[in-house]
Amino acid sequence: GKGAYDGTSENYTGMLGMHGTKTSNLGVSECDLLIAIGVRFSDRVLGNPKKFAKQAKILQIDIDPVEINKNIIVNHSIIGDVAIVLGKLNEKLEQQKHTEWLSHIADYQKMYPMTIPKEGLSGPFMIAKIYEMAKDAIMVTEVGQHQMWAAQYFKYSKPRTLLTSGGLGTMGYGLGAAIGAQTANPDKQVINIAGDGCFRMNMNELATASRQKLPLIEVIVNNHVLGMVRQWQTLFYKQHYSATVLDDGVDYVKIAEAMGAAARRVTTQEEFNAAFQEALESKTPFVIDAIVDSDDKVWPMVAPGAPINECFDGKDFESKNK
């Protein structure tokens, strides 16, 4: 999905759903026509299915008839190859400007921009910096907060440039996928974004990458916790933390070096910038152990089971819980 529509376009509003942008969530909630192309309407997108896009007529296009009306009942459906179907639809369209609607969405984009913390090292900062320094890279992710930041802050403009375990959510997926992508695309830069929890699950594959002399980059967003689970425990379970702390002194730099990779630990924006530039110039696997705050959260967010137009950010949450 990411990259199928140019992420640099002024009409691109970002991801939809639990960690989608406020603009996308509000836009879908207010639109009168929703064309869903090759989507499965997962729970992370729908929120509360009974309140999803209630003002819209929904047209679902998919090559697999099993997907039609599976998770939500749509008004119309077309079964077929998307490229052929869209071509046929284009033949039927008449030129329309939709000035008022586009202006309304543009106002939302101004009101609810995706911001990056100016101080300190953070996931959003690193993803935005990676995009600035390596726009044409193939991005790979593990599963968790870092995965959401990689979807939010890297502007994908081409298909098949984000490899991620979306629906299955398999921690440990990324490093092996990055090795495969780098092997298949030796002239491309491949970057795997991992959390420290995910990295532990398949870090032995660094030895494979080193043996094959693959110049992939592994960025560990190291917050010493299972960040996404901890975020839920903070927001919805009264800070009852269970089985999410990983602060046991494991040295990922030494582990990486022992497996033949170059490695750096960074704690500031400046150190990350320098380490990432060094990684881009490396001819072997390069690991960046980036230390971030354990309480960093992915914003915006929709509470599980809530309608997507009830998305909130950190300021909203603090105001509600004063």
Question: How does the language model describe each region?
Answer:
Residues 211-304:
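Thiamine diphosphate
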Residues 74-86, 204-222, 303:
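A short alpha/beta connector and helix-capping loop motif
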Residues 1-59, 158-187, 203, 235, ...:
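Glycine-rich, anion-gripping cofactor-binding loops and their flanking helix/strand elements
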Residues 55-143, 269-273, 278, 284-322:
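Phosphate/pyrophosphate-binding active-site segments
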Residues 173, 177-215, 221:
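Catalytic phosphate/nucleotide-handling subdomain of diverse soluble enzymes
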